[in-house]
Swiss-Prot record:
SUPFAM superfamilies: Adenine nucleotide alpha hydrolases-like, Argininosuccinate synthetase, C-terminal domain. L-citrulline binds at residues 86, 122, 126, 174, 183, 259, 271. GO terms for cellular component: cytoplasm. Homotetramer. It comes from Listeria monocytogenes serovar 1/2a (strain ATCC BAA-679 / EGD-e). Its EC number is 6.3.4.5. This is Argininosuccinate synthase. InterPro entries: Arginosuc_syn_C (IPR048268), Arginosuc_syn_N (IPR048267), Arginosuc_synth (IPR001518), Arginosuc_synth_CS (IPR018223), Arginosuc_synth_type_1_subfam (IPR023434), AS_cat/multimer_dom_body (IPR024074), Rossmann-like_a/b/a_fold (IPR014729). The keyword Cytoplasm applies. The gene is argG. Keywords: Amino-acid biosynthesis, Arginine biosynthesis, ATP-binding, Cytoplasm, Ligase, Nucleotide-binding.
Length: 404
């Protein structure tokens, strides 16, 4: 009798390597699936390792471009910062991974999908809600959450089954990375009073080690999409990765954040997102130049909601679809170039230009070239201030008594 097939989100690390053997012992035929979303994984090595550990098949997928164009771009155009700080690094990759897991499951005729998340993080929610949204008939299994082993028990299990134990297992941090940034938690970071050690960082340098000379970059957007960096056209994924290097060497994008997790606890997270911070800063500046006032004032409401919705694992939901539709409708005239100075942890906008700019220098100037009709201000002020004046006239006639 054929075994039930299960597709495992495989990273090549200890947890998911042990999960392969555990699932095999549980009676499954395991198909491993690993995505590269910009963290620079050695996909060939991971593919071979999955087979060595016990998977019957191993898929490795380079998904950098899809991640950049269909997921990171939404976060960029939404200026997405959960709680005003976190640019949704891991939260963005989970729905894409879930989508690919479902595609592989359909191709292989699998009846279940497994992931390597623990029972106290947000990712278990994101994976399972996304999978159920895309394939409600598929069962979801969480080995790490189910077996409840200590780290020592997990290592012993690996050794007993000849599963390679990673040489960096003593790394005190839990790290997740994609092209939109790098997240870091656990170890000494669990004490919110402790200063993050430099060992916690990889994409950025400290302010002390940042160069004393700034880099100036010019980012060109077409309909809200970054299309070139310093005059060189490149794919969105390559542009983000290139900007990670340039902005990272200036210490741009370090974030130390106490975060309210979806599962109800607070966690201390350290993020590095040099490209994300730089691009969001530039994109916001271009919107300020090209948006009418009413859209500029309303869009932040949508931005906050879409940030929360994505963080909470609802990427594949009617609400997210509606929010993204509004977002896309605002980007038609977000065209132009922004000049940004990268220096000592800062991304500072120093220049902006756009064929769709609503800034009129002749209206803004106080020189003799001024074309603003100042006489029109008198009537405008009378009408604008009329409700305030009427309120004052009416209520000034009311005697207010205060009892002591």
């Amino acid at each position: 009798m054929a075994k039930e097939k299960i597709v495992l989100a495989y990273s090549g690390g200890l947890d998911t390597s042990v999960a392969i053997q555990w699932l095999v012992e549980s009676g499954y035929e395991v198909i491993a699936c690993c995505l590269d979303v910009g963290e620079g994984k050695n996909l060939d090595f991971i593919k071979e390792k999955a087979i060595t550990v016990g998977a019957s098949e191993s898929y490795t997928i380079d998904a950098k471009e899809e991640f950049a164009e269909d997921f990171a771009l939404i976060a960029l155009q939404a200026h997405a910062y959960y709680e005003g700080k976190y640019p949704l690094i891991s939260a963005l990759s989970r729905p894409l991974i879930a989508k690919k897991l479902v595609e592989v499951a359909r191709q292989e005729g699998a009846s279940a999908i497994a992931h390597g998340c623990t029972g106290k993080g947000n990712d278990q929610v994101r994976f399972e809600v996304a999978i159920h949204a895309l394939a409600p008939d598929l069962k979801v299994v969480s080995p790490v959450r189910d077996w409840k082993w200590s780290r020592e028990e997990e290592i012993n299990y690996a050794k007993e089954h000849d599963i390679p134990v990673p040489i960096d297992l003593d790394n005190p941090f839990s790290i997740d990375q994609n092209l939109w940034g790098r997240s870091n938690e656990c170890g000494v970071l669990e004490n919110p009073w402790t200063t993050p050690p430099e060992a916690a960082y990889d994409l950025t340098v400290s302010l002390e080690d940042a160069p004393d000379t700034a880099d100036i970059v010019e980012i060109t957007f077409d309909a809200g999409i970054p299309i070139s960096l310093n005059g060189e056209n490149m794919s969105l994924a390559n542009l983000i990765l290139t900007l990670n290097e340039i902005a990272g060497k200036h210490g741009v994008g370090r974030i130390d954040h106490i975060e309210n997790r979806l599962v109800g606890i607070k966690s201390r997270e350290v993020y590095e997102c040099p490209a994300a911070v730089t691009l969001i800063t530039a994109h916001k500046e271009l919107e300020d130049l090209t948006f009418v006032r009413e859209v500029a004032h309303f869009k932040p409401i949508i931005e906050q909601k879409i940030s929360e919705t994505i963080y909470n694992g609802l990427w594949f939901s009617p609400l997210t679809e509606a929010l993204v539709a509004f977002l896309k409708s605002t980007q038609k005239f977000v065209n132009g170039t922004i000049r940004v100075k990268l220096f000592k942890g800062h991304a500072i906008v120093e220049g902006r230009k756009s064929p769709n700019s609503l800034y009129d220098e002749n209206l803004a100037t106080y020189t003799s070239s001024d074309t603003f009709d100042q006489d029109a201000a008198v009537g405008f002020i009378k009408l604008w201030g009329l409700p305030t004046k009427v309120n004052a006239e009416v209520n000034s006639k009311v005697t207010i008594t205060t009892e002591v």
